[in-house]
Amino acid sequence: MQEHYEPDALERQAQTWWDEHQTFRAREDAPGEPFYCLSMFPYPSGRLHMGHVRNYTIGDVISRYQRMQGRNVLQPMGWDAFGLPAENAAIKHLVPPAKWTYENIAYMRGQLQRLGFGYDWDRELATCRPEYYRWEQWLFTRLVKKGLAYKKTAMVNWDPVDQTVLANEQVIDGKGWRSGAPVERREIPQWFLRITDYAEELLKGLDGLEGWPEQVRTMQRNWIGRSEGVELEFEVPGEAPLTVYTTRPDTLMGVSYVGVAPEHPLAARAAEGDGKLAAFIEACRHTKVSEADMATLEKKGMDTGLKAVHPVTGEPVPVWVANFVLMEYGTGAVMAVPAHDQRDWEFARQYGLPVRQVILPAEEGVAVDLDQAAFTDKGVLIESAQFNGLSSAQAFDAIADFLEKQHKGRRRVNYRLRDWGVSRQRYWGCPIPIINCPDCGPVPVPEEQLPVVLPEDVAFDGVGSPIKRMPEFIDTTCPECGGKAERETDTFDTFFESSWYYARYTCKDADGAMLDERARHWLPVDQYIGGIEHAVLHLLYARFFHKLMRDEGLVDGDEPFTRLLTQGMVLKDGAKMSKSKGNTVDPEALIERYGADTVRLFMMFAAPPELSLEWSDSGVEGAYRFLKRLWKQVHDHVQGGAAPALDKAALNADQQALRRKLHQTLAKVSDDIGRRTTFNTAIAACMELMNELGRFEDKSGQGRAVMQEALETTVLMLSPIVPHIAHALWSELGREGAAVDQPWPVVDESALESDTVELVVQVNGKLRAQIQVPAAAARAAIEEAALADENVQRHIEGKTVVKMVVVPGRLVNVVVK
């Protein structure tokens, strides 16, 4: 065995061995219970970053550990390959997005392989390949036929220079991020999926996801946002009635105005003869509006001059256009109660609108100062005619009953969740499989004509989508009437691809169907790993898609992922690593210098997986030193020749103590990796054990036998984390087969039993010594041993022992004065 640890050569040898033996190829007929471990696949940006390395190391450690537990493990990898960055790179580097993407995939695949991740590369998929996206096109055509996909006009951010729709995050200070042109709010036709049809099931399903972090479940519950309230109508003379939804019907008698969105049809009609109102509405169209912006947006509005009729009192209520009312949320109209809603209060103060208190605090003596803020708690009704004196809860029912009897309202369960707009006016995405016919309307592309292939060899300049200028792509015939028609040139939101990729890995080569029987064999995913930033959109859409595929008879079960681990970010100097901050660390340079195992070890040791990890050069050095020490420990042991067989009955006290430490460590590491997924504490326990091994100098036959067992077990415990060095050391220790194929070592319960116990000795509650006593020692013997300790004697000298407290198996406290 060579004396020094040389990671580069031994890592390549281990990887070659795994490749030649197809170690990580998953087979449905292999022995063992299936275990599907999946890390969220990367966008092929060109280079792996440390966040990737952390995510994928966690997944690999879990996969390798489960393999050693006898499970039949599937761990695949692929590429979330469509999306905006490829278009930006195409503009910058003058290459087609496809070419840039495929080159990046090739490079990043090599980087992943160099890190030694145990992926089944036969299952690799890229979402930009037609053989992948043809099946989401097929599913979409099924959803259209079922009425679960539909087209309607929706407000978007439109860049008039780049001729494209911008996502909210691409609008910076009201201007397009690339062109700098003022962004317009436009209504354009878009495709939607009826995720709201599944809102209640998506919400209730969260209760069963006990293997998910509570934080993620809470975020999804809030995003779905179920509320119970009342939908009611305010008549507007000469116009259609205004429908509003409220969760606080108890405040109905305090309404002092109704707010409508700038895009509301009523606002448009009111502006027809009012130039100032028209100008205000136009200004609102240039304001970026998302829910997040609403909290900080300056509240602005204008009176339309129209009056709505209060559904209970019949009083006229002014109708205002307000920039904080969103057309895409609810009905685009709200009833405003300034006394009991802070946003309504701020608006009313700004424009001098009445503030009518109709709720008193339930507790007497609580002061309400409506000059300072709205009173938003529930309480008891006042100034509310026949509803006076009712509690807010009683008034909810009484007012709902009244409105229902008068046919002016109805109880309703509402969701904050909106249908998912899946159209993107971009090029680099999956074409939406629709043919637009002037006579038949939108018609799904027939199954036999799928996939609709995205042309990849295009000149891309960033102005509009190149396929909009390609008659050979657009011009076609209608499948229903045979007349001239045009293909849809919009593409799917890229969340579409990532919503079902986990299922396609199970049967990547299925040619005749989206999924086959193999999906039932592997699904659901046993362990999913990814960033908390995907808590809502990706994870919610994947849950939605699983239900869509279930309802197509493609999968069993209701949920895609049994357990979820959300790893923390990798920070440097307290900030997330990013190119813009100039604080990135290149994984490749580290691997070249220290080897993949050192990088993997540092990533797992520096922090628990759920917490952020602070980058530390000295921490990487420390991980490297530990592996060198492990190598030297095995080298020095092997130099002594083969160790004899272990004879447990022949061990002396020191040998027994080392075995006890070994099996205590094994029990802890098994729990830390297998149940708690706290890899950092597992590694710390192995390091502590290595320190004990370093101090163990017994070169007798049984001393070497215990050392052999300890080194073999340590190598196997560390093998999921540092698999390359484990591969080399396992054979150097003279063992048959490969470390990767070994079962996880088993704790010897008999080794954990001890004839002695260690007790803490305190003097007046302060730790002064630790003593070893026989496990069956009588109280008198324990007290005698405690008082005989040198350090204890120093601290009681010249004092009187008042009493001694003995807690069996734990401590002795000597009370003196």
Swiss-Prot record:
Q: What is the lineage of its organism?
A: Bacteria, Pseudomonadati, Pseudomonadota, Gammaproteobacteria, Chromatiales
This chain is encoded by the gene named leuS
Q: Give the location of motif 'KMSKS' region in residue numbers.
A: 576-580
The UniProt keyword set, sorted, is: Aminoacyl-tRNA synthetase, ATP-binding, Cytoplasm, Ligase, Nucleotide-binding, Protein biosynthesis
Family to which this protein belongs: Belongs to the class-I aminoacyl-tRNA synthetase family.
Q: What is the E.C. number?
A: 6.1.1.4
Extract one GO cellular component term from the record. cytosol
A Pfam family (short name) is Anticodon_1
**Keyword Cell division attached:** no
Entries under CDD domains matching the protein: Anticodon_Ia_Leu_BEm (cd07958), LeuRS_core (cd00812)
Q: Which HAMAP family match?
A: Leu_tRNA_synth_B
Catalytic EC class = ligase
Stated name of the protein: Leucine--tRNA ligase
Residues the entry annotates as binding ATP: 579
**Motif span ('HIGH' region)?**
42-52
Entry-linked PROSITE patterns: AA_TRNA_LIGASE_I
Q: Which SUPFAM superfamilies match?
A: Anticodon-binding domain of a subclass of class I aminoacyl-tRNA synthetases (SSF47323), Nucleotidylyl transferase (SSF52374), ValRS/IleRS/LeuRS editing domain (SSF50677)
Listed under catalytic activity are: tRNA(Leu) + L-leucine + ATP = L-leucyl-tRNA(Leu) + AMP + diphosphate
Q: Where in the cell is it found?
A: Cytoplasm
